[in-house]
Amino acid sequence: NNKNELVEKLDFFKIDLVIIGPEIPLANGLADLLRKKDFKVFGPNKDGAKLEFSKSWAKEFMQKANIPTANFWKVNSIEEAKKIINLSSIPLVVKADGLASGKGVFIPNSIDECFKAAESIFNGKFGNSGNIVVLEEKIQGPEVSIFALCDGERYTLLPTAQDHKRLNEKDTGPNTGGMGAYSPAPLLTEEYLDKIIKEIVEPTINELNKRNIDYRGVIYFGLMIT
């Protein structure tokens, strides 16, 4: 938490490469600070980390880059959320905008459950991560994970994976940070993976470059196959 103390320790131990894994230090700009101090860092700068720590920013990024994504609404109050929920003709997923250790996504089965999920977020369940709520069209299908190792301009794909987030057996219960995963994801054929690269991975890299976002690290793509 003490950035100055961390820099002193890195200098003292003559660290050649700093690998930043957790999202919170990246969201707080640790990679930016260390690069200014001339350390070699594996991990995106704060702007790049927004893809992970702000769902609304990531959704708007995808829209701008013409990346397929579910319809969504960014809301700033419970009143605004309730209005959209009441008017919606499609099932919705309720998400805290910020980091919530993988627990900030609610999959309600009724309008009342939508209200309760939005209320719990706005009432501080996830602190400042819940200052904004994202209401998203609910889509069905298996989830897969794609990982791209990026140097700021180019990328190479790592092996695919399929994780299971629901707490209980038979894919039921609330979402967690992950109950288990296996790799590679068997449902991703070479043809399907080529489609994902063309429609999702490459447009993401191109949009980052257009915005002059120096993304050096692993980009995680959490996808739902419909």
Regions found by a protein language model. Give the residues of each.
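Internal nucleotide-binding/catalytic subdomain
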Residues: 108-226
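Short, well-ordered alpha-helical microsegments
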Residues: 26-28, 81, 143-144
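A conserved helix-loop-beta module that forms one wall/lid of the active-site cleft
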Residues: 42-104
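CheY-like receiver
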Residues: 9, 13, 83-84, 117
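ATP-binding N-terminal substructure of ATP-dependent carboxylate-amine bond-forming enzymes
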Residues: 1-47
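Structural detector of well-ordered beta-strand residues that form the stable sheet scaffold
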Residues: 19, 42, 93, 134-136
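Short, charged, surface-exposed secondary-structure boundary motifs
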Residues: 7-9, 50-56, 168-170
